[in-house]
Amino acid sequence: MADLRVILRKPTIADGDEFINAMKASRRFHRPWVQPPRSAAAFTAYLKRLRIADHDGHLVCLRGSGAIVGVINLNHIIRRAFQSAFLGYYAVAEYAGQGLMFEGMQLTVRYAFRRLKLHRLEANIQPGNSASIALVKRCGFLREGFSRRYLKIDRQWSDHERWALLAENWSAHDTA
């Protein structure tokens, strides 16, 4: 993992301007898949949500320059018998297609399974989002099903494919 081009780090209020500018510049790229925070108030609300026990999130940043290339969140972390979380993620358009989110996802999966001791990660992806589906496939996620009108995005209910990765399946592929 030492040869990765990215690192994960927790977002802070100091990231606000860079984050907001990156999300505004990526608006077309994100539509219709996701609506990340694009204002100071929305970014502050995002930071506040990450302080809740069942949410965790990281910026994916270039090693060296620290530029934000994406975001990966672990949402609705459920403990006890479930030990699971739902992934949410998005790239900054300028850095898309370079494999950087794949590297960030590798680090996130490692963090979730090793540090947080989760058993299952789930990603719910709109069927037309081929880049996102390719990312989770490359990371070892398996398609488990289809959820009709699963999530409301941009004021419309959207169908999603359900993809999941279990800790025991990941550990067989983890070489670091």
What residue ranges belong to the model's regions?
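A short helix-loop-beta-strand connector motif used in the catalytic cores of GNAT acetyltransferases and
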Residues: 48-59
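Acyl-donor (CoA/ACP) binding surface of acyl/acetyltransferases
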Residues: 1-18, 22-27, 61-176
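Conserved GNAT-fold acetyl-CoA-binding loop/helix
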Residues: 28-47
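A generic secondary-structure signal
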Residues: 46-49, 111
